[in-house]
């Protein structure tokens, strides 16, 4: 069914010298992660990483969440346990690469 989606983003830097937030919006995706017919949108993906783990963590996590969520082997809607496994896998990558200084990512994704 055709529909129109308009998305906006805004950010408040606060007291830090730079904004560490990272947002990723992919609209109108097929399960392959590729754009679909512009009139139809089976999946819209919104990811927000608030930077509390540091900018490097936010920049690392956002595209990886996109890749894991849009994996061709996934069946939607994703089950809570599967989403938890995705977050655990990315967290283990962060720790393994020495990027994460803490055990949390502070990211949300919606599809």
Swiss-Prot record:
UniProt xrefs under PROSITE patterns: PPM_2
Pfam families named in the record: PP2C
Cross-referenced InterPro entries: PPM-type-like_dom_sf, PPM-type_phosphatase-like_dom
Keywords per UniProt: Coiled coil
Coiled-coil annotated residue ranges, if any: 3-29
Record's keyword annotation contains Coiled coil: yes
Protein name as catalogued: Uncharacterized protein R306
Domain PPM-type phosphatase intervals: 6-111
């Amino acid at each position: 069914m055709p529909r129109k989606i308009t998305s906006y983003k805004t950010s408040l830097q606060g007291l830090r010298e730079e904004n560490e937030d990272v947002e990723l919006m992919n609209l109108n995706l097929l399960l392959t992660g590729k754009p679909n017919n512009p009139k139809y949108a089976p999946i819209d993906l919104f990811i927000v990483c608030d930077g509390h783990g540091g900018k490097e963590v936010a920049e690392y996590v956002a595209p990886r969440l996109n890749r894991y969520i849009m994996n061709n082997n996934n069946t939607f809607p994703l089950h809570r346990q599967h989403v938890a496994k995705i977050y655990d896998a990315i967290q283990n990558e962060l720790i393994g690469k020495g990027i994460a200084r803490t055990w949390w990512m502070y990211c949300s994704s919606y599809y």
